[in-house]
Amino acid sequence: MSGLASLVPMVIEQSSRGERAFDIFSRLLRERIIFINGEINDDVSALVCAQLLSLESDNPDKEISLYINSPGGVVTSGFAIYDTMQYVSCPVSTVCMGFAASMGSFLLMAGTPGRRIALPNATILLHQPLGGFQGQASDIQRHAERIGKTKQRMAELYAQHCGRSYEEVERTLDRDHFMTAREAQTWGIVDHVFDTRKKAA
């Protein structure tokens, strides 16, 4: 989102106190809508986690909508968002528009059960975590062990949220696995495929 800063439109609101201008994302945040658009990294993670916690503070029971169009990114950054989604008391609906890959698909399936949505032309990609390391052989071995544990934990959580066996998830994550919106629904990544907001209401 930061790369589009110069393209973000402003919304003008009139009130008894005068005229106020908001960027479109701040305006949508007032409606409890959060966007993840692009790569997931520490900056995006900090922003999304802060928005989730702020909205929970405003109203701990009202739904938050998280819209995702992301190729994935840093695993630890994604886990920070995942844990915060589970931590807050608000239900969190997730909506895939465009593409949810890797950590993007992981966050998509982490929404509140019954509130995980894909738009009809969305594409979802699952695969195992990626990593590359340099250094001493002993350090490379430790990194390899760590990424193996991360892969195992991700498979456990996919199985938990999607209603699949651990073994099936592990096989699916072994290679790039693309899904249509309907295939993602069948697999348990999302609960619904909606083409209009009226159907989601």
From Swiss-Prot:
Please give a single GO biological process term from the UniProt record: protein quality control for misfolded or incompletely synthesized proteins
Tell me which HAMAP family the record gives.
ClpP (MF_00444)
Please give the catalytic activity noted in the UniProt record: Hydrolysis of proteins to small peptides in the presence of ATP and magnesium. alpha-casein is the usual test substrate. In the absence of ATP, only oligopeptides shorter than five residues are hydrolyzed (such as succinyl-Leu-Tyr-|-NHMec, and Leu-Tyr-Leu-|-Tyr-Trp, in which cleavage of the -Tyr-|-Leu- and -Tyr-|-Trp bonds also occurs)
- Family membership: Belongs to the peptidase S14 family.
Q: Do you know which NCBIfam families this protein is assigned to? A: PRK00277.1 (NF001368), PRK12553.1 (NF009205)
Q: Which UniProt keywords apply?
A: Cytoplasm, Hydrolase, Protease, Serine protease
According to its UniProt entry, what is the function of this protein?
Cleaves peptides in various proteins in a process that requires ATP hydrolysis. Has a chymotrypsin-like activity. Plays a major role in the degradation of misfolded proteins.
Q: What is its main location?
A: cytoplasm
List localization entries. Answer: Cytoplasm
Return the protein name: ATP-dependent Clp protease proteolytic subunit 1
EC number(s) on file: 3.4.21.92
Cite the GO molecular-function annotations of the record: ATP-dependent peptidase activity; ATPase binding; serine-type endopeptidase activity
Residues of the active site are 102 (nucleophile), 127
Q: How does it assemble?
A: Fourteen ClpP subunits assemble into 2 heptameric rings which stack back to back to give a disk-like structure with a central cavity, resembling the structure of eukaryotic proteasomes.
Pfam families xref list: CLP_protease
Class of enzymatic activity (EC top level)? hydrolase
Output the Gene Ontology cellular-component terms.
cytoplasm; endopeptidase Clp complex
InterPro entries membership: ClpP (IPR001907), ClpP/crotonase-like_dom_sf (IPR029045), ClpP/TepA (IPR023562), ClpP_His_AS (IPR033135), ClpP_Ser_AS (IPR018215)
